[in-house]
Amino acid sequence: MERVTIIGIIFAILVVGWILATGQWAYGNVVGPLVNHSKIPLLKITYVSAYENAKGTYLILNITDCCGPDAYPASAPIMEIYNSTWHVFLYSYNISNDTVKVIQAPWNENKKDYTNWYSGFVVILGSEAQFQLQLPFHLSPGTYHIKLYTPAVSSKVLAKQTATFTIS
């Protein structure tokens, strides 16, 4: 073999060794489990209120995205409203059609929260918005729970995306 080829092979082995060594040192993923430290979106309902009107139930939700990546917003394409005897699922197209107003928080300067037919509620990391929905059905008096379903989250996270309200 030529001298240049031998030096190239030795250099390549050293580079691969350096990459594997720093990967093991920093992340422990050469020998051991592969670790993914990416954040999972977490939507929180900070306020909920509802009242009956002639058209059905008027629902007011303050939703914030308090954890997750800032490269793309968190979404909740499914919302469940339930109590001990009854439940309904609102899918993204229902959420989009029933939303009559979105009030942005004052600190939402550049990116705005919104709804659409595909993603349902769309909330930017660190922002908060009030979503006002006119539901086309009446809720009987009682205590209800709302749960927002975010794609790819565990049941522990879903438990945190729940709020309670009362219709009197």
Swiss-Prot record:
Temperature sensitivity of activity: Increasing activity in the range between 20 and 92 degrees Celsius.
A GO molecular-function descriptor: thiosulfate dehydrogenase (quinone) activity
Enzymatic class: oxidoreductase
Subcellular location: Cell membrane
Keywords: Cell membrane, Electron transport, Glycoprotein, Membrane, Oxidoreductase, Quinone, Respiratory chain, Transmembrane, Transmembrane helix, Transport
Subunit-structure text: Heterodimer of a large and a small subunit in a 2:2 stoichiometry. TQO may associate with the terminal oxidase formed by doxBCE.
Protein name, UniProt field: Thiosulfate dehydrogenase [quinone] small subunit
Species name: Acidianus ambivalens
Taxon lineage: Archaea, Thermoproteota, Thermoprotei, Sulfolobales, Sulfolobaceae
